[in-house]
Design a protein with these regions (language model features):
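Divalent metal-cofactor coordination and adjacent catalytic microenvironments
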Residues: 1-119
């Protein structure tokens, strides 16, 4: 399951119909990749962050990995979720006149705490 499923993205954008599902899916993928790039995450790191499994009660199951503790993983996921939703909302609202430089600067600020290579 993805970190942010389509139904959650649509809820965040306040979109009720399925008319724009394809567009929202494309923008969601772009927002995810942009956030991964800005955070300087490797493919392995993103795979761990993006792999979420739930039990029958809807609780997140622990992920076997050597990169993060469960607490760190939860923190990184939360930061990534906020950044991805922000980027998605920005791209959705500014389809025609998006200022990608301003978006990237905002994402750097949002992702600073998990950004790789920042001392």
């Amino acid at each position: 399951m993805a970190l942010i499923p389509l139904f959650e993205a649509k809820t965040y954008l306040r979109v009720d119909s399925s008319d724009e599902d394809a567009l929202i899916g494309i923008l969601l993928s772009s927002a995810e990749q942009l956030c991964v790039d800005v955070a300087r995450l490797s493919a392995g790191q993103w795979k761990v962050i993006d792999s979420i499994a739930f039990d029958s009660e809807g609780n997140v199951l622990p992920v076997e990995n050597e990169l993060y503790t469960e607490e760190e993983l939860e923190c990184v996921r939360n930061v990534m979720r906020v950044a991805i939703l922000y980027a998605l909302g920005y791209l959705f609202e500014h389809r025609e006149e998006a200022d990608h430089h301003a978006l990237t600067l905002t994402l750097r600020s949002l992702l600073f705490s998990i950004r790789e290579g920042v001392v």
